[in-house]
Amino acid sequence: MLITIEGIDGSGKSTLLARLRELLADLDPLFTREPGATWVGESVRRAIAERMDPITEALLFCADHAAHIDTVIRPALDEGRLVISDRYADSRFAYQPVVLDGVLPDPLSWLRRIHEGWSIRPDRTFLLVLPVEDAVSRLGPEKKREYFENAAILEQVQENYLNLAAADPLRFVVVDALLPKEEVARFIAGEIRAGARSSRRRPRA
């Protein structure tokens, strides 16, 4: 079973995932993340830091996703393990269209075509949503933020996320990230447990 956790920067994913490790320890899930679970992730981080051109950056994210699936996710799913990923393909579908706006005529369609035939569809995606001003306030001093960690960009990203969720309501669970952190964590842990009891591998996207 593949679970993904999504949300804009400052939505509380890191805190949530740390608590899920505790609440779901008996299920022995594999926790992973994008980017960063593979060596390609190093190139992605460099691209972000050095502000490479948008298409190069997007393709590096896709390359990291491919390596992540091949070396981490697919082997774990083949063993019947529960996999929980901090970000996945939906992060690209939410963030990169903002970066690629004006570069390509239809960035989302372009990104979806790149993923066709090999990306694995998550069984469930939990999307943490909160007012952007609250998310930005959690990110610390502005001078230490990455270029996409500003309110104008995050507003567009969250709108993209909500559009993705509206288009795929059977997979997405939208969660109010302003609720108490323990309440959020226990709700999501309960949903994951319920799904794990009856899960069957879904076909690739």
UniProtKB/Swiss-Prot annotation:
Gene3D superfamilies: P-loop containing nucleotide triphosphate hydrolases (3.40.50.300). Signal peptide: none annotated. One of its GO terms (cellular component) is cytoplasm. CDD domains: TMPK. Its EC number is 2.7.4.9. It holds the Pfam family Thymidylate_kin. Disulfide bonds: none annotated. ATP binds at G7, I8, D9, G10, S11, G12, K13, S14. The keyword Nucleotide-binding applies. It catalyses: dTMP + ATP = dTDP + ADP. Keywords: ATP-binding, Kinase, Nucleotide biosynthesis, Nucleotide-binding, Transferase. One of its GO terms (molecular function) is dTMP kinase activity. One of its GO terms (biological process) is dTTP biosynthetic process. Belongs to the thymidylate kinase family. NCBIfam families: DTMP_kinase (TIGR00041). HAMAP family: Thymidylate_kinase (MF_00165). This is Probable thymidylate kinase. It comes from Methanoculleus marisnigri (strain ATCC 35101 / DSM 1498 / JR1).
